[in-house]
Amino acid sequence: MLSCEGSVDYGVLHLKTPVLMILGHSDCGAIKAYLKGFNEETYNIKRELDFLLPIINKTANELNFEKQLSTTIQHNIDYQVNIAYKKYRDIVKNKKLTIIGAYYDFKNEFNKGYGRIIITNVNKNKEQILDLSEFNEVRNNVNEIYVGRLIE
């Protein structure tokens, strides 16, 4: 969201898109590079990733790197959804926009199958996602919706 704000604004404010999806993914190279330290990267790459610092601080005590990576990816999704929600709050409250946080799980970390998109957050709501009114129409047209979280 932060690195492409103008494009997102255009879609939400001018094209009136009804859904904004923030999609993170398994084994994210950008987050992996940030976690390992990225001293060799260019200034512009470092600047793109600087917003991760508050998120990294939440996962700094994880002993297992893979667990820290997955947890950081999900925190990043939540963080980006929160930013979008603050920015577009009035549009969301008027039911003109739904902000969905999702995790493209090509490593099967959620045990729902490889390559699934797992919904983790809707308009900052992380619980009872399938009960939200935003999914009324979707429930009738989709065989299965995958919802889950790796973190609380």
Segments the model singles out, each with a brief description of its role:
Residues 1-18, 30-152:
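Divalent-metal-activated hydrolytic enzyme cores
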Residues 22:
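Conserved functional hotspot residues or short segments at active or partner-binding sites
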Residues 26-27:
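Internal, conserved structured core segments that host functional sites
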